[in-house]
């Protein structure tokens, strides 16, 4: 389990989306916006501060649109993480830009270098509105990143995002999806002590005895995390430790 936890913690540090309010969805003042649009029209949009990715990050649909009018690729990848404008917009909670990019043909399943999708980013930011918009336009509910094989539901369970987790499940996400090390969303929710997520997952068919690569179940994880109320809930639904299952020949 230690390897799996290290991986999960690294993932938390990597994604880091769900920015403070002052950093997301904040349109520039009209004068600044007009200057940016003019520079884009003049073909000076190679500068980072007025690039299509920066405009998507800032939540500036007019500048994004002007970049596209000037021939910028709606699915262009940046040099930092291989993110497309849609990944930036989804990650920073800029729904208006997300909507516009989708109408302009943005790939809703575009992947960054590490395999994260716009839906992963929206889930990480606990943005139900953007998550639903992406799903309704074809986003893969069960897409996994390249290295750790983490699906959006793993991420929602880890971070305790109940509304987004509920949306993913309602739309058909696999509740017993396993990551690279065999961990399920229920493993994540139990370790972090997210009682409401645990209840939600179990109510929708999560296996309380799913084993990770080390043969440990959610009950093993929660007992290390010291969340007694979750231990009781898992036991109520037939949850056992890996050792108990092994003794029973399972």
Question: Language-model segments: what does each one mean?
Answer:
Residues 208-250:
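Leucine-rich solenoid repeat scaffolds
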Residues 2-8:
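Sec-dependent signal peptide recognition
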Residues 45, 78-79, 112, 145-146, ...:
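Ankyrin repeat boundary/linker residues
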Residues 50-53, 84-87, 117-120, 150-154, ...:
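Ankyrin repeat (ANK) core detector
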Residues 54-60, 88-94, 121-127, 155-161, ...:
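Ankyrin repeat A-helix N-terminal signature
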Residues 60-68, 94-102, 127-135, 161-169, ...:
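Ankyrin repeat structural motif
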């Amino acid at each position: 389990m230690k390897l799996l936890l290290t991986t999960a913690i690294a993932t938390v540090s990597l994604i880091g989306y769900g920015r403070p309010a002052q950093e997301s969805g904040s349109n520039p003042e009209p004068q600044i916006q007009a200057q940016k649009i003019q520079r884009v029209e003049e073909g000076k949009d190679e500068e980072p501060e007025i690039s299509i990715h920066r405009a998507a990050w800032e939540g500036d649909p007019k500048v994004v649109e002007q970049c596209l009018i000037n021939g910028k690729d709606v699915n262009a990848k940046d040099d930092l993480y291989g993110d497309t404008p849609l990944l930036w917009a989804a990650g920073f909670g800029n729904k208006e830009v997300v909507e516009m990019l989708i109408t302009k043909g943005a790939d809703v399943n575009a992947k960054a270098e590490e395999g994260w999708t716009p839906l992963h980013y929206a889930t990480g930011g606990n943005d139900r509105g953007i998550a639903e918009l992406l799903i309704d336009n074809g986003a893969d509910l069960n897409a996994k990143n390249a290295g750790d094989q983490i699906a959006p539901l793993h991420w929602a369970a880890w971070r305790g995002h109940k509304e987004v987790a509920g949306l993913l499940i309602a739309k058909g996400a696999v509740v017993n999806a396993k990551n690279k090390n065999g961990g399920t969303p229920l493993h994540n929710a139990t370790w972090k002590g997210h009682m409401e997520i645990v209840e939600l997952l179990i109510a929708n068919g999560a296996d309380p005895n799913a084993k990770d690569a080390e043969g440990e179940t959610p009950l093993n994880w929660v007992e290390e995390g010291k969340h007694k109320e979750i231990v009781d809930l898992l036991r109520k639904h037939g949850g056992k430790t890996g050792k108990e299952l092994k003794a029973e020949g399972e």
